[in-house]
């Protein structure tokens, strides 16, 4: 899942902004106590799948977390993200792909708290929900209201989601659906422009956003399956030990 997150620019930008907020909080802190720093960095430091809670158990052995190392990696990730944005804006796909590999390697080495991890996944889900919403509105206007056959819609709309002239050939076709499409052209194009904004924000095509979402779903399924298998294995071990006694 973390590998999928590293391929979605809005996630990387969110981490940048989160880190910037952390830096601002630290700058305002008069007392640079190590415990307080750990609390602030809890987004990026956890032990045994639990966010570190400072002084939550006075009898527990203190967990050593290298705040400097965490900050170093996040700074590195931020620089790499800025570099990626620049390459994407310059439309340099080859160098951008190489930069994505570096980002993936860095992010895979950053330990993220479960709470932040869920939040990062939600960013991808939110983008996908927006894609579904605008595509549904376009489909409602084109297929349900105008009567363009669903097969034809799917065949030509996929890959042309943000091509604003896509609907024109069906308006010019002088079919039963043409006049209704012409009446609703402004609404159709408006939704296509909303889809285009999602592409601009993510530096991905609509199909690219869908692919990231598919990868995320597959990753979550694999993670859930692995957890289930671990629980079942532990249960079998407990039963095996119990039988001996």
What residue spans do the PLM features occupy?
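Transcription initiation cofactors for RNA polymerase, centered on bacterial
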Residues: 1-245
């Amino acid at each position: 899942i973390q590998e999928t997150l590293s391929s979605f620019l809005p996630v990387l930008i969110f981490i940048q902004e989160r880190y910037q907020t952390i830096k601002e909080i630290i700058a305002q802190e008069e007392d640079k106590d190590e415990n307080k720093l750990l609390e602030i960095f809890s987004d990026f430091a956890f032990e045994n799948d639990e966010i570190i809670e400072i002084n939550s158990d006075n009898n527990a052995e203190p967990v050593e977390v290298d705040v400097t190392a965490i900050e170093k990696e996040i700074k590195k990730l931020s620089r790499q993200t800025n570099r990626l944005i620049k390459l994407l804006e310059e439309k340099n796909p080859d160098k951008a792909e190489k930069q994505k590999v570096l980002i993936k390697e860095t992010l895979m080495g950053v330990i993220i708290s479960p709470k932040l991890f869920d939040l990062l996944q939600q960013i991808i889900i939110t983008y996908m929900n927006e894609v579904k919403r605008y595509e549904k509105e376009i489909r409602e206007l084109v297929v349900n209201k105008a009567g363009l056959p669903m097969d034809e819609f799917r065949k030509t709309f996929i890959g042309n989601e943000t091509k604003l002239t896509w609907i024109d050939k069906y308006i010019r076709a002088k079919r039963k659906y043409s006049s209704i499409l012409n009446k609703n052209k402004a609404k159709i194009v408006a939704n296509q422009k909303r889809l285009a904004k999602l592409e601009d924000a993510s530096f991905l095509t609509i199909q690219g956003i869908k692919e990231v979402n598919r990868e995320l779903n597959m990753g979550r399924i694999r993670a859930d399956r692995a957890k289930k298998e671990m629980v079942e294995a532990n249960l079998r071990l407990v039963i095996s030990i119990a039988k001996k006694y």
